[in-house]
């Protein structure tokens, strides 16, 4: 009887091991030429990574970021502080709470300076403090998320010129564009966009997981049913950014034991890399490592 139990346990463990799956890699385009992009990505509405480092020479890559002594990406505050009075959207979050505020760009930059007013930085976090600089207990993280390029000073917009494939692959209609800045870890929950999306990494590293429209909708609907939620699938809603819904979505998308691993595409993005996300494809994004991360994206059609 003991031998039978041992064999049964071993078989169960073997089955569990052999059925473990991993996400598939996002295909990489042969080159970054417009015809290639149209033929192999845009027209068939297929996720694709442009050749690595295609946008490494984009001005923002070198102007907005520096390398510290540990070769980690940091903000070039001397350059960016010139536009400190610009009002930007910030997300303040921790495991259980999330809120959005609008503050000056200088307020955001100060959150990455040790001992700054109302904010204190450590080497491996972007902890936000709501009281004096001698406070020692972190309360949340600060992320400049989805700041429209149209609301930024012209000089900063010029640092992230719109790529040719955005302007010429389709109708030439750029629906919107945004900047994303924050020290890892950063997080965007599972959602889908109403238009095709070109996502360019400027600094640091991000990992993206994608699901086709049918699978992604199934994941989202499953989580909403389990938690009794009613979130929008196309908005970065507050209910998706903290608490029960965030944890449930994150588990289905990112947990190694998730049943959706085999239905997932995954890519790690570094500075200069660009990912095409077709309309309707569900995706979730994480900033990883200890670097400052920076990204820009364009929604177009």
Q: PLM features: what roles do these ranges have?
A:
Residues 1-13:
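N-terminal chloroplast transit peptides
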Residues 14-276, 284-301:
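N-terminal accessory scaffold of Fe(II)-dependent oxygenases
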